[in-house]
Swiss-Prot record:
It comes from Vitex agnus-castus. The gene is TPS4. Belongs to the terpene synthase family. GO terms for cellular component: chloroplast membrane. Mg(2+) 1 binds at residues 540, 544. This is Ent-kaurene synthase TSP4, chloroplastic.
Length: 789
């Protein structure tokens, strides 16, 4: 981890970087440039990737003048009259701002309390050792002229400000530092400190921890046992240089000194606000890249970070397990990427957080949101504690949203909208490209975070991330628009638009592919997914509305025979159009897949379609005979008739990895398909219950009531179906993420999860393709480029 003084330096390591960013931003607004401009843009693109790759390997963090000042106050263990770290004093003398303060240049205007605290700490350090009188006077002048900010409610209060700042003013008096402050405001500050101390002195573990964290504001009120019980293996208290320095000043301790020396050995003559923070910073980078849709460019670098994080997880590293945001992020990112991590540490941490207002600063809504997102990743039936905590965190977020004031440790972040979306659309109903676009459009340039003082890091976010993600999104989208035009031509060429009974859902079918399989190299998989989506819609409508029993049987017979003369063997024009489109499309996908797989796959695709046709025919016969199946009979047929097989299964052959005959006949393959399809069928049945009852169709809700003797309500039946969906969805995700005993390649398994997310989104509000919200996201993913303003 390296230090930077100014957050502006994070983005200006190369002057050409700004020129590149500015140039390409303009090009996104005005269209494709000439060849020369394209070359420049390409060079800039590659340079940006290199900078991000470098950033993944390291962690950069801003200097904390506040923490450096407290370290500078530490006396030598050999003489209380000499500083232990004179280099820190020299750094303070060299880094005062022109206005007399000690603050990062270009700091946020709402951080005046932070600047006051940092400046006062620096003045105290210089005064304590009797150096820099002129610097002290300028600092005092700044404090006196900006003192009113300490009482302004609109200003952001760093953690512990009401305790620490008044205590430092007391210390200033002890050092005979003459501060001419407005008496009424000073008394108000002292009164607030008294109230804060009284509120926290109830001897509970969480309050004790909080007061230990703000040790520099406790002075003689500190208790040795209460403070030092929080010392970590590295010698620090809470990985905070300022807390550790204050604790050492009050209670000299060799391990505290070892920690401070190690920090200065790593960073030189100034320290950050938190150390170590490498794991969290690197995970933030990985999470940023994933959420912006550009992680595929850095797979090797990300793999290195994840492997190292997993090693630290298994070792019980305190940097992970003693910090709520880091633990939550590590759990979510590792589990999401298939690492075998138990939920025990996260549930234990959450238990402590719910019994503690301090642990991990859970009152910060960013921490709460991070914990909520982690708690969503429930994979196993025995993770009941995690499930309960997920509901508690959800309630906590809802309460925060309804309150007048939301405390956030991150500046410039549209946290209200982020929380609302997380509550409305859980991760299993949020499609990748929708997530990417939302994160790009609401991207937060201000990478400042706030604890006892503000700090910033390019790992939290920077312009390189935004530039690369916008360029990637728009370039992929241009490919997607062309593919959709190709799909529309295919519909006309195959005369599918002539089938008046059939819904025309071309854009929606393509959207479900583009929103999940968005990389340019997955074009064949997208087109297979979309074309088969259109065809399954047509066939479904043919069985429901457009075809007679004779026509349906004829269609099945044609697919069984395959090599037939359509001019003589088709019983109607509708059958001819449908079969011809099916055959043409299956052969095309089969040819492309066979080249990639180096074996023939066409017969397997035909079999997949026959399974669908047989299941649809069975439902037709049940309806004709007025047969009421058992629940088991219904599900065993309905998951196939839901028609996801022809959409997902052929596409597996086109995403890259080789799939052997053994793989596609393995139980894992079938389980993934059945779990995905059952979720989809039950989601459809819950949302479409009223409509399907009116149409005389079979539906899981009334069938479940009938199979239970009619003794349960429709609401109870729907609740049971939702529980079944949840169980199947979690099992599906577990199989997708499982690597150790898996037969199928992960990139193939992910298609089942992608489709599951599509279904959960499509059925989140309305019955299928009817939601206005869905129309908006289709436009956003396929038609509307992102324009940087």
């Amino acid at each position: 981890m390296s230090l930077q003084l100014s957050n502006s330096l994070f983005f200006a390591r190369k002057e050409s970087h700004f020129r590149c960013f500015s140039h390409v931003s303009a090009s996104l607004d005005t269209g494709v440039r000439r060849v020369t401009s394209a070359k420049i843009a390409s060079t800039c693109f590659e340079e940006t990737k290199e900078r991000i790759a470098d950033l993944i390997h390291k962690a950069e963090l801003s200097v904390s003048t506040y923490d450096t000042a407290w370290v500078a106050m530490v006396p030598s263990p050999n003489s209380s009259q000499e500083p232990c770290f004179p280099d820190c004093l020299s750094w303070l003398l060299q880094n005062q701002c022109c206005d007399g303060s000690w603050a990062c240049p270009h700091h946020h205007p709402l951080l005046k309390k932070d600047v006051l605290c940092s400046t006062l700490a620096c003045v105290l350090a210089l005064k304590k050792w009797g150096v820099g009188e002129e610097k002290i006077n300028r600092g005092v002048h700044f404090i006196e002229h900006n003192f009113a900010s300490a009482m302004e409610k609109c200003q952001i209060s760093p953690m512990g400000f009401d305790i620490i700042f008044p205590a430092m003013l007391d210390y200033a008096r002890d050092l005979l530092l003459n501060l001419r402050l407005e008496p009424t405001m000073l008394n108000d500050l002292i009164y607030k400190r008294g109230l804060e101390l009284k509120r926290n002195q109830n001897h509970s573990a969480e309050r004790e921890a909080y007061l230990a964290y703000v040790a520099e504001g406790m002075g003689k009120l500190q208790d040795l046992g209460s403070v030092m019980k929080h010392q970590r293996r590295n010698g620090s208290l809470f990985n905070s240089p300022s807390t550790t320095a204050a604790a050492f000043i009050a209670f000299p301790n060799s391990r505290c000194l070892t920690y401070l020396r190690s920090a200065l050995k790593k960073f030189g003559s100034a320290v950050p606000a938190v150390y170590p923070l490498d794991i969290y910073l690197q995970l933030c980078t990985v999470d940023n890249l994933e959420r912006l849709g550009i992680s595929r460019y850095f797979q090797k670098e990300i793999q290195g970070v994840l492997d190292e994080t997993y090693r630290c997880w298994l070792q019980g590293n305190e940097e992970i397990f003693m910090d709520a945001p880091t633990c939550a992020l590590a759990f979510r990112v590792l589990r999401k990427n298939g690492y075998n991590v138990t939920s025990d540490p996260i549930t234990k941490l959450l238990e402590e957080c719910f019994s503690s207002s301090f642990c991990g600063n859970i009152k910060d809504i960013n921490t709460t949101l991070g914990l909520y997102r982690a708690s969503e990743f429930i994979l196993y039936p025995d993770e009941r504690d995690l499930e309960k905590q997920n509901l508690m965190l959800k309630n906590l977020l809802e309460q925060e949203l309804s309150s007048d004031f939301i405390h956030s440790s991150q500046l410039g972040r549209n946290i209200d909208a982020e929380v609302k979306h997380a509550l409305e659309y859980p991760f299993y109903a949020d499609l990748d490209r929708i997530v990417n676009r939302r994160n790009i459009e609401h991207y937060n340039f201000d990478n400042t975070r706030i604890l006892k003082t503000s700090y910033c890091s390019p790992n939290f976010g920077n312009k390189d991330f935004l530039f690369l993600s916008v360029k990637d999104y728009n370039e992929c989208q241009a490919i997607h628009r062309e593919e959709l035009r190709e799909l529309e031509r295919w519909v006309i060429e195959n005369r599918l638009d002539e089938l008046r009974f059939a819904r025309q859902k071309c854009a929606y079918c393509y959207f479900s592919a583009a929103a999940t399989l968005f990389a340019p190299e997955l074009s064949n998989a997208r087109m297979s997914w979309a074309k088969n989506g259109v065809l399954t819609t047509v066939v479904d409508d043919f069985f429901d509305l457009g075809g007679s029993v004779e026509e349906l049987k004829n269609l099945i017979q044609l697919v069984e025979l395959w090599d037939v003369d359509v001019s003589t063997e088709c019983s109607s024009q509708n059958v001819q159009i449908i079969f011809s489109a099916l055959k043409c499309t299956i052969c095309d996908i089969g040819d492309k897949g066979s080249k990639l797989q180096e074996r023939s796959i066409t017969n397997h695709i035909i079999d997949i379609w026959l399974d669908l046709l047989y299941s649809m025919m069975k439902e037709t016969e049940w309806a004709r005979d007025k047969y009421i199946p058992t629940m088991d009979e219904y599900i065993s047929n309905a998951y196939v008739s839901f028609a996801l097989g022809p959409i997902v299964l052929p596409a597996l052959y086109l995403v890259g990895p080789k799939l052997s005959e053994e793989m596609v006949h393995h139980s894992e393959y079938h389980n993934l398909y059945k779990l995905m399809s059952t979720c989809g069928r039950l989601l459809n049945d819950i949302r479409g219950c009223e409509r399907e009852l009116k149409e005389g169709k079979l539906n899981a809700i009334p069938l479940y009531i009938i199979n239970n003797g009619g003794e349960i309500t429709k609401e109870a039946a729907a609740s049971e179906m939702k529980s079944l969906i949840e169980t199947h969805r979690r099992e599906l995700l577990r199989l997708v993420l499982e690597g150790k005993n898996s037969v199928l390649p992960k990139s193939c398994k992910e298609l089942f999860w992608h489709m599951s997310k599509v279904l959960h989104l499509f059925y989140s509000k309305d019955d299928g393709f009817t939601s206005q919200d869905l129309i908006k996201v289709v436009k956003a993913v396929i038609y509307e480029p992102i324009v940087l303003k």
